[in-house]
Amino acid sequence: MFRRLALLLFALPGVLGIGAAAQERDSALSNYRLGSGDVVSVQVLGEEELRREKIRLSDAATISYPILGEIRLAGKTVGELEKLIRDGLQGRYLLNPQVTVTINEYRSFFINGQIERPGGYPFQPGLTVRKAVSLAGGFKERASKEKIFIIREDDPKQASTRVDQNATVNPGDIITVEESFF
C-alpha cells in the first residue's frame, strides 16, 4: 500500500505538468488567426449537407458556404468562425446549430540562411526555433547558433527580431540563421 501511494505521489507532478503544458498550448492556439494556406473543416451536428472537409484557404481566405454564401476567414479565430456560422444558420435554417471548425493543417513557416535544407515547412503546434532547425536538417557547419532572427507574419512592421533557439515559431514566420565568422 505504501509503495503504491509513494509511486502515485512521485508520478502526479509529472502528469500535472504535462496537462499544464497541453493547456498552455491549447490556449495559445485558441488565439490563432486563420490565414492563407491553412486547411480547415466545418461540421454542423446532424447536418451532413453543411459539412465541408479540408478546405485550403486561398490568398483571399474566403469560402463559399451553403445558405450563408461567401465567408471571409482571414484573421478570424476558430471560435469566431464557429460563432459566425452558428449565428448565420440559427433561426434562418436551424434552431440551435452545433458548429465545429477544425484546423486540419496550419500554414507553413519558412527557414533560410545557414541551414541544411532551407525552405517552407508545415507548422506544428509547440514549434520552437530549435525544432524548426531540426526539421530543416540542422545547422550548416558555419551557422551561428546565436545570430538567429525571426520576421513575424503578424508584425505590421515586418521587423527582424533576434531570438534564441527556444523562441516560439508561428505559422507564416520567416526564420533566418546567419553565418558565424569564427
Residue ranges of predicted features:
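Bacterial N-terminal signal peptides that target proteins for export
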Residues: M1-L7
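Ser/Thr/Pro/Gly-biased, low-complexity, turn-/loop-rich segments
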Residues: F2, A20-F182
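Bacterial N-terminal signal peptides
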Residues: L8-G17
